């Protein structure tokens, strides 16, 4: 019995220990919710401790006599790392909690839930450990100084401090020798560089000298050399006898022995450091150079390919700065003033220069009437606001003056015709410029577009235009820069009626003008004007924007006295249903836009406008005919897409007579027209956008598309064809040959809907620059790219290299997008809805843009649960970024 007892005791212990182990591991799963809550609570405590330490450091480092201890910095870095890990962990907590079952005591995937639960426990322990280490008796120590001249500056706000920290970290990186700071005038570049200068006085003796030089537009090499020499102890009478090269040698001999920082403020062109005598900063010598400029091009010429943009302030940051300038007493003098002050601050659009000047001007205004008047002036004629011309517009004008040539300046000023904060389509803007004669249309469409985009790029890099972040095809103008452009257009305010811009201000009638003969440009777009009756002598008028109004009728007299009108835009006047015959008197007209109007018949006089090169008749739902268009023999761009207009053989013949035509957009809804039009190589080369609609199977069983090198956008809707084939040329000898080179080299957007006979879209292999693909409501589509057909065409073509967005809607038969995983180096969004048979996406863990999220939207929650991922790594890569979203139809 004794022997048995001695054996049973160790067995009990083993069982007990094994049970405890199972309980511990089981707790990773069934205590997951509780453990996550504990982790979140511990993280809040750690953040609070981090905040206390940072606040102590800011107080002690403020004097510039203290620097933080290394152990404190190590602890802060560890906290940042654990915070990032915590955020990553938290992103997938909903998925993990949904995976639990049996009231949280089990999981649909024990392995994944166990791993996640264990990570939660391990992180909880690490957070608690870091929190306990965050008690410091001392956080900083005394530090020596570099040779720095501190420069006074006005108090700054949180947003500017964040920008400072970012710039400082970039400059102080070991591999960084030179930092470029660029941004529009008045955005705070000099303030930022000043704070960088002063910060060097608070760090240790890593640098021997910090040199500040104001360069400006008129600076010379000699002037820069003199400023540097004064700082390093050179100069004297003998310098007047030396040339620039000899002085450069002297400066170089001094600086090569010292670890220096050179800060160059306000440079307008490349500063040749070698010519000045400054050793080029490198990792080896440990020296630093930072500069500010208004032009990103200058950054490139200085050898900085990744400069830091100094941006306008966010709305709340703008309000903080504006409050600081106006003062608490003024803001508190009447309960309505803070609300009005916010409206005034918004007019500045985050530009610190404007916030400072306007804030100071309003600091003594303590009545509601004064604030309301300020809003009225800033809205209707900002140039009349106190300080606007002298302190803001003159400062910004330096950027305009620095533009190279009158062409660039004219193109810039043209952008001020659009309303405040208006998104301007780049290609549409270039079409205006071509029609105005800024760009010579005889150079050909491709050259014109390239030149136009080069001008836009230059203006963006000069911070005079802003490129839209989401949609790179749009630009806009900062409101204060727009005021500067309007001021310049009016000869610096001397001829305010030379360029009349009242866009988007709620006008109901054409404004009164003292002398119409002096008016060159008028923009009344985005208003509520209904009738245009007046007739005026507009001998100098070249541009008239009336788009996006409520115009119902235009009198016959209106067009009689505009002999030099070149651009007329009447688009998006949806109540406009007729035009007077007197349109024929606009003999100089080159650009005419009637899109989105309800005009049912074009006046015969329109066909007499022989100078017309751009005619837009898109989305005209009532237009019946354009017979006679061949009389516009100089026409180069013609928009017909989405109009009620029927494209028949007689119209095709007229289009073939337009010898100068370069761009056309149209709809094809008849097989009788499709074949002859697609056999006309000259017309095919002009097609930029085309929609095939209502082509029935009995008439077009196979749609054969020729090479369309200029095609940008393609729609195929409600068609019955069974297959789409591609031919490389339009000649009959090659009609059935498979293409070996891209046939749609510029095609970027494809829409296919309600084509119930199609089985696949393998022809998309020959659209290498496709960025957007939407396929919907086509019940027989089984493959986007058929593996079998793809091998027949070319085994070497990899599809969708440029694809950014993929939408798949109600494709009940869709089984595959592609047979194997693709790299998708540009893909950002996949949206799948009502595609029940699609079980696998062509993704692996390396698909998508490196370091960026690829969002998968799905319409049915059960679909995402059935997706078969390539492997676990792929699932972990994409499942957390999958989101339910029902498509609005």
From Swiss-Prot:
ATP binds at residues 183-190. InterPro entries: Apaf_helical (IPR042197), LRR_dom_sf (IPR032675), LRR_R13L4/SHOC2-like (IPR055414), NB-ARC (IPR002182), P-loop_NTPase (IPR027417), Plant_NBS-LRR (IPR050905), WH-like_DNA-bd_sf (IPR036388). Residues 140-444 form the NB-ARC domain. The keyword Coiled coil applies. GO terms for biological process: cell death; defense response; defense response to bacterium; plant-type hypersensitive response. Pfam families: LRR_14, NB-ARC, WH_DRP. SUPFAM superfamilies: L domain-like, P-loop containing nucleoside triphosphate hydrolases. A lipid is attached at residue 2 (N-myristoyl glycine). Residues 29-58 form a coiled coil. It is a lipid-anchor. Keywords: ATP-binding, Cell membrane, Coiled coil, Hypersensitive response, Leucine-rich repeat, Lipoprotein, Membrane, Myristate, Nucleotide-binding, Palmitate, Plant defense, Repeat. It is found in: Cell membrane. The keyword Cell membrane applies. GO terms for molecular function: ADP binding; ATP binding; identical protein binding; nucleotide binding; signaling receptor activity. GO terms for cellular component: plasma membrane. Gene3D superfamilies: Helical domain of apoptotic protease-activating factors, P-loop containing nucleotide triphosphate hydrolases, Ribonuclease Inhibitor, Winged helix-like DNA-binding domain superfamily/Winged helix DNA-binding domain. Belongs to the disease resistance NB-LRR family. In uninfected plants, interacts with PBS1 through the coiled coil domain. Homodimer. PANTHER family: NB-ARC DOMAIN-CONTAINING PROTEIN (PTHR33463:SF220), NB-ARC DOMAIN-CONTAINING PROTEIN-RELATED (PTHR33463). The LRR repeats probably act as specificity determinant of pathogen recognition. RPS5 is absent in cv. Landsberg erecta. This is Disease resistance protein RPS5. It comes from Arabidopsis thaliana.
């Amino acid at each position: 019995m004794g022997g048995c007892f001695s054996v049973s005791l160790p067995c009990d212990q083993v069982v007990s220990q094994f049970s405890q182990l199972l309980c511990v591991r089981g707790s990773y799963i069934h205590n997951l919710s509780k453990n996550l809550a504990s982790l979140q609570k511990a993280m809040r405590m750690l953040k609070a401790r981090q905040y206390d330490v940072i606040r102590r450091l800011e107080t002690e480092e403020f004097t510039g006599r203290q620097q933080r201890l290394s152990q404190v910095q190590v602890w802060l870095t560890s906290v940042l790392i654990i915070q990032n890990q915590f955020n990553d962990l938290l992103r997938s907590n909903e998925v993990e909690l949904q995976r639990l079952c049996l009231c949280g005591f089990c999981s649909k995937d024990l392995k994944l839930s166990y791993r996640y639960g264990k990570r939660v426990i391990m992180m909880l322990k690490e957070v608690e450990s870091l929190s306990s280490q965050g008690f410091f008796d001392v956080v900083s120590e005394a530090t020596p100084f570099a040779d720095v001249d501190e420069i006074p500056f006005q108090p700054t706000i949180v947003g500017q401090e964040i920008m400072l920290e970012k710039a400082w970290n970039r400059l102080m990186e070991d591999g960084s020798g030179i930092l470029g700071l660029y941004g529009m005038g008045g955005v705070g570049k000099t303030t930022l560089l000043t704070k960088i200068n002063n910060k060097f006085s608070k760090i240790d003796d890593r640098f021997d000298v910090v040199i500040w030089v104001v360069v400006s537009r008129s600076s010379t090499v000699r002037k820069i050399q003199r400023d540097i020499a004064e700082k390093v102890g050179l100069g004297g009478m003998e310098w007047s006898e030396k040339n620039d090269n000899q002085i450069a040698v002297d400066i170089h001999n001094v600086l090569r022995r010292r670890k220096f920082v050179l800060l160059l403020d306000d440079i307008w062109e490349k500063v040749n450091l070698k010519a000045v005598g400054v050793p080029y900063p490198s990792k080896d010598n440990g020296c630093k150079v930072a500069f500010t400029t208004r032009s990103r091009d200058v950054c490139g010429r200085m050898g900085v390919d990744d400069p830091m943009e100094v941006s306008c302030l966010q709305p709340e940051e703008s309000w903080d700065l504006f409050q600081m300038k106006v003062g608490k007493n003024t803001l508190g003098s009447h309960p309505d003033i803070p609300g009005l002050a916010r409206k005034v601050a918004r007019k500045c659009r985050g530009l610190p220069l404007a916030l400072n000047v306007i804030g100071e001007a309003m600091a003594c205004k303590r009545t509601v009437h004064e604030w309301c008047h300020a809003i009225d002036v800033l809205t209707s004629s900002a140039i009349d606001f106190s300080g606007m011309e002298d302190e803001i517009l003159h400062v910004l004008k330096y950027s305009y003056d620095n533009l190279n040539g009158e062409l660039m300046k004219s193109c810039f000023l043209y952008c001020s015709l659009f309303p405040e904060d208006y998104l301007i389509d780049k290609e549409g803007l270039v079409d205006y410029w071509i029609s105005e004669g800024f760009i010579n249309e005889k150079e050909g469409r491709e050259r014109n577009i390239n030149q136009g985009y080069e001008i836009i790029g230059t203006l963006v890099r000069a911070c005079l235009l802003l490129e839209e972040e989401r949609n790179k095809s749009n630009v806009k103008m900062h409101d204060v820069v727009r005021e500067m452009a309007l001021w310049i257009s009016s000869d610096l305010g001397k001829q305010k009626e030379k360029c009349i811009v009242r866009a988007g201000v709620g006008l109901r009638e054409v404004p009164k003008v003292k002398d119409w003969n002096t008016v060159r440009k008028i923009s009344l777009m985005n208003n509520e004007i209904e009738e245009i009756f007046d007739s005026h002598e507009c001998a100098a008028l070249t541009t008239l924007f009336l788009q996006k109004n409520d115009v119902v009728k235009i009198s016959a007299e209106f067009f009689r006295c505009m002999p030099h009108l070149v651009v007329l835009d009447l688009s998006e006047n949806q109540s406009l249903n007729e035009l007077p015959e007197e349109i024929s008197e606009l003999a100089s007209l080159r650009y005419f836009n009637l899109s989105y109007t309800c005009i049912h018949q074009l006046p015969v006089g329109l066909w007499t406008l022989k100078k017309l090169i751009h005619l837009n008749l898109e989305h005209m739902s009532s237009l019946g005919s354009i017979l006679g268009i061949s009389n516009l023999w100089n026409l180069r761009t013609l928009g017909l897409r989405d109009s009620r207009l029927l494209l028949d053989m007689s119209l095709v013949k007229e289009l073939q007579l337009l010898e100068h035509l370069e761009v056309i957009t149209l709809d094809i809804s008849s097989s009788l027209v499709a074949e002859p039009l697609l056999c006309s190589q000259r017309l095919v080369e002009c097609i930029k956008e085309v929609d095939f609609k209502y082509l029935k199977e009995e008439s077009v069983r196979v749609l054969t598309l020729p090479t369309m090198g200029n095609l940008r956008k393609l729609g195929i809707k409600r068609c019955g064809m069974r297959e789409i084939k591609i031919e490389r040329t339009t000649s009959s000898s090659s009609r059935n040959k498979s293409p070996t080179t891209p046939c749609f080299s510029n095609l970027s957007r494809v829409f296919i809907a309600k084509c119930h006979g199609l089985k696949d879209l393998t022809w998309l292999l020959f659209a290498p620059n496709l960025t957007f693909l939407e396929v919907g409501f086509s019940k027989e589509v089984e493959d986007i790219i058929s593996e079998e057909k793809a091998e027949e065409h070319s085994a070497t073509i990899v599809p969708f290299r440029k694809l950014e967005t993929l939408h798949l809607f109600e494709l009940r038969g869709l089984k595959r997008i592609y047979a194997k995983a693709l790299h998708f180096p540009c893909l950002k969004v996949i949206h799948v809805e009502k595609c029940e048979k699609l079980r696998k996406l062509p993704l692996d863990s390396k698909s998508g843009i490196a370091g960026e999220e690829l969002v998968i939207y799905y319409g049915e929650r059960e679909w995402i649960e059935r997706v078969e991922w390539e492997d676990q790594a792929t699932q972990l890569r994409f499942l957390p970024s999958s989101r339910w979203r029902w498509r609005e139809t």
